[in-house]
Amino acid sequence: MKWVTFLLLLFVSDSAFSRGLFRRDAHKSEIAHRFKDLGEQHFKGLVLIAFSQFLQKCPYEEHVKLVNEVTDFAKTCVADESAENCDKSLHTLFGDKLCAIPTLRDSYGELADCCAKKEPERNECFLKHKDDHPNLPPFVRPDAEAMCTSFQENAVTFMGHYLHEVARRHPYFYAPELLYYAEKYSAIMTECCGEADKAACITPKLDALKEKALASSVNQRLKCSSLQRFGQRAFKAWAVARMSQKFPKADFAEITKLATDLTKLTEECCHGDLLECADDRAELAKYMCENQASISSKLQACCDKPVLKKSHCLSEVENDDLPADLPSLAADFVEDKEVCKNYAEAKDVFLGTFLYEYARRHPDYSVALLLRLAKKYEATLEKCCAEADPSACYGKVLDEFQPLVEEPKNLVKANCELFEKLGEYGFQNALIVRYTQKAPQVSTPTLVEAARNLGKVGSKCCVLPEAQRLPCVEDYISAILNRVCVLHEKTPVSEQVTKCCTGSVVERRPCFSALPVDETYVPKEFKAETFTFHADICSLPEKEKQMKKQAALVELVKHKPKATGPQLRTVLGEFTAFLDKCCKAEDKEACFSEDGPKLVASSQAALA
């Protein structure tokens, strides 16, 4: 590749922020501009999400009042952009609304201290008070008849409650995507409420929607964590790798533009700038659909859809076909005599080009693996370009990638084989033992949640064709481990977890995989009450029964971290038989009272 091309790409990279999407300086009133672009329905939905994500304890009715006030003000500004306060930034307008709430300090304590700050510090302060694990009651879905009655009486209020409940429990949920899920939810209700058996129609559809929405939430949280901890450069590298895999026929200039725009709008949503984010996401979708010829042959079906469905479809579009006869990577990145000169003159562009070329050739790799390879290449050039004979030093760099590639491949193979042998529930239990031994100080509910989510990787990824397994497994696990890290950062208890969570995001999964049993942990004292159960467990749904048993398994491992597999299987087998027997007994509680102490005694003996 000639160096003039690099200079062109450098120009493209530096100028991308000023192209296309980002033209907000031209508008006298930002809020009027966003209202006109988004339309009233989406505007109100986004404002509701924003307030729900910042003020997670407030009831729905209070948020609706704020939303209506902001919407009325926006309409005033649409009518006259020079009206009072219409020229204020959205941060200022939203921050002033939050700070005007009379009960702010009573309800949110230290959050009220943010109001003494000026923008942008005030908004940053609000962001720091978002709670990833708010103290809210579990959301219980009403029965189908009650839901249909509420939906048919007032669909707008019904869907408003949905946005509010999801947003306050997931304060980093990707706002325009949440609007998409609300649309899907509404369509399910419209379809199913006309059916004779409403529950049979609603339950499986909403369960599937919930699963997808939760996956979307953890993926977005990983993106926000990456931006918060490592900044735009790290996220843009992720975006370049992913876009290059999806759109291998697009040139580097096009990929750079898409990655830059995606980085900007993702940062907006992560910073709570939801109106800008949603508007810019729609603009990016428009740009992609207007430039399909230079991006991908797979976009047309998405581009025929309305805005929310279009953006969602584009984010999940299948990878385009690889270009024919791609040249060897070695020519530009190993054999070229000016590798060190090209690297020194524009490091980020040179590395970005390497990442682009490698990623477009490897849709079968995870983004995290591609970034580890780019990091290895960068470290090799840093070392070798300072030596007397650089080319002799970096000549084998592509061969040195092999161990980095083999490690996740072996992980996927071993875990998918284990999943196929044990099934999802058994695989989750194996992960519970593994992760409790690595981090026994972590709370039992967090370990159960993490292991159950990690265990879903089997049914999600191991069923895919071989070429799709690695990216599915590692990128999914990265998102789940980020959830563990976010919760652990709030209340750190394990030095091993802290070590993995504070390092590089792309090294996090290998770090967790390599963690040994924590030898510093002092085993928990055995308490009979931890393993005492009553007849009420028999009436629980199967999922909740599983979680009770898995919590007991965590506690067993915390009591005996070095328990062997056969020991744990013996105890779990006895426990399952005990539950089966007592739940079938005529006098269930008497059975639990009589056989429970025997189970506790035999468990202690088995683990002795």
From Swiss-Prot:
* Modified positions (Phosphoserine) in chain numbering: 29, 82, 89, 297, 443, 513
Q: Which InterPro entries match?
A: ALB/AFP/VDB (IPR000264), Serum_albumin-like (IPR020858), Serum_albumin/AFP/Afamin (IPR021177), Serum_albumin_CS (IPR020857), Serum_albumin_N (IPR014760)
Q: Which residues form the signal peptide?
A: 1-18
- Family annotation (Pfam families): Serum_albumin
Q: Which residues carry this modification: N6-succinyllysine?
A: 460, 543, 588
Q: Which GO terms describe its molecular function?
A: enterobactin binding; lipid binding; metal ion binding
Which residues are recorded as binding Ca(2+) 1? 30, 268, 273, 276
Give the residues the record marks as binding Zn(2+).
91, 271, 273
Q: Which domain of life is it from?
A: Eukaryota
Positions bound to Cu cation: 27
Q: Which residues form the Albumin domain?
A: 19-211, 212-403, 404-601
At which residues is Phosphothreonine found? 444, 446, 570
Per the UniProt record, which residue ranges are transmembrane? none
Tissue localization of expression = Plasma.
Cysteines engaged in disulfide bonds, as pairs: 77-86, 99-115, 114-125, 148-193, 192-201, 224-270, 269-277, 289-303, 302-313, 340-385, 384-393, 416-462, 461-472, 485-501, 500-511, 538-583, 582-591
Q: Which residues carry this modification: N6-methyllysine?
A: 558
Q: Which residues form the propeptide?
A: 19-24
Q: Which Gene Ontology CC terms are recorded?
A: blood microparticle; cytoplasm
- Cellular localization per UniProt: Secreted
Positions with a binding annotation for Ca(2+) 2:
37, 279
Q: Keywords, A to Z? A: Calcium, Cleavage on pair of basic residues, Copper, Disulfide bond, Lipid-binding, Metal-binding, Methylation, Phosphoprotein, Repeat, Secreted, Signal, Zinc
Q: What does this protein do?
A: Binds water, Ca(2+), Na(+), K(+), fatty acids, hormones, bilirubin and drugs. Its main function is the regulation of the colloidal osmotic pressure of blood. Major zinc transporter in plasma, typically binds about 80% of all plasma zinc. Major calcium and magnesium transporter in plasma, binds approximately 45% of circulating calcium and magnesium in plasma. Potentially has more than two calcium-binding sites and might additionally bind calcium in a non-specific manner.
Indicate the family of this protein: Belongs to the ALB/AFP/VDB family.
Quaternary state and partners of this protein? Interacts with FCGRT; this interaction regulates ALB homeostasis. Interacts with TASOR. In plasma, occurs in a covalently-linked complex with chromophore-bound alpha-1-microglobulin; this interaction does not prevent fatty acid binding to ALB.
**This chain belongs to which protein, by name?**
Albumin
Taxonomic source organism: Mesocricetus auratus
Could you read off the lineage of the organism from its UniProt record?
Eukaryota, Metazoa, Chordata, Craniata, Vertebrata
Primary gene name: ALB
